Amino acid sequence: MSRRNPCKFEIRGHCLNGRRCHYSHNYFEWPPHALLVRQNFMLNKILKSMDKSIDTLSEISGAAELDRTEEYALGIVGVLESYIGSINNITKQSACVAMSKLLIEINSDDIKKLRDNEEPNSPKIRVYNTVISYIESNRKNNKQTIHLLKRLPADVLKKTIKNTLDIHKSIIISNPKESTVNDQNDQTKNNDITG
């Protein structure tokens, strides 16, 4: 059996060509230098994903600096409202990142209180449960939640964002003492101006 050259895609991660690829995917056939390159690449990938100082969010989900500029100017709620209203050229990516940040701010216990006040057959219960499930998913893995939100059709995403914003406003009305996302954004801006 003749030794084939190692697949360059497999060396640098994973080959997507499947059976069409004519190069070797059998690591036992590979020369030592190819194995070392693959091992080095995989170790760097693991190290990068574990390093908290590197902004993996922008690399993995595409949350670029432009999105953060919009968020700084408009605030999280402003970005989401702009996306719903199709103004300020807010991208789906920006909206999903802002939505993830809003979900961090909302306490699921507050939503459960609102849900318990509803009639048993109210359609709002389903909306509350959906938002609660997004909050719990976001707490476990916010990058995966951003990815799930991005996969929603635009109209469904807009409806989900609108429902979440409505719930957020209801919580603020029922708990006026708690600081809101907008208040925190304003406070950050004031600190930047004065500091």
UniProtKB/Swiss-Prot annotation:
Chief site of localization: virion
One Gene Ontology biological process: symbiont-mediated activation of host NF-kappaB cascade
InterPro entries: Pneumovirus_M2-1, Znf_CCCH, Znf_CCCH_sf
Residues carrying Phosphoserine: S58, S61
Gene3D superfamilies: Pneumovirus matrix protein 2 (M2), zinc-binding domain
Region annotated Oligomerization, chain positions: 32-49
ZnF region ranges: C3H1-type: 1-28
Segments for region (Binding to the phosphoprotein): 126-163
Positions of region (Disordered): 172-194
Domain of life assignment: Viruses
Keyword Cytoplasm found: no
Stretches for region Globular core: 76-171
Keyword Metal-binding appears in the UniProt entry: yes
Localization of this protein: Virion; Host cytoplasm; Host nucleus
Binding partners and assembly: Homotetramer. The homotetramer interacts with RNA. Interacts with the phosphoprotein (P); this interaction is required for protein M2-1 function, localization in host inclusion bodies. Formation of a complex host PP1/M2-1/P allows P to target host PP1 phosphatase to the M2-1 substrate. Interacts with the nucleoprotein (N). Interacts with the matrix protein (M); this interaction directs M localization to cytoplasmic inclusions comprising viral proteins L, N, P, and M2-1 and mediates M association with the nucleocapsid. Interacts with host RELA. Interacts with host PABPC1 (via C-terminus).
Functional description taken from the UniProt entry: Acts as a tetrameric transcription processivity factor that binds in a competitive manner to RNA and the phosphoprotein (P) to prevent premature termination during transcription. Transcription anti-terminator that enhances readthrough of intergenic junctions during viral transcription. Preferentially binds to poly(A)-rich sequences. Plays a role in the association of the matrix protein with the nucleocapsid, which initiates assembly and budding. Also, can activate host NF-kappa-B through association with host RELA.
Description of its domains: Contains a zinc-finger domain on its N-terminus essential for its anti-termination function. Contains an oligomerization domain. The central globular core is responsible for binding to RNA and phosphoprotein.
Family of the protein in this entry: Belongs to the pneumoviridae M2-1 protein family.
Protein name: Protein M2-1
Organism: Human respiratory syncytial virus B (strain B1)
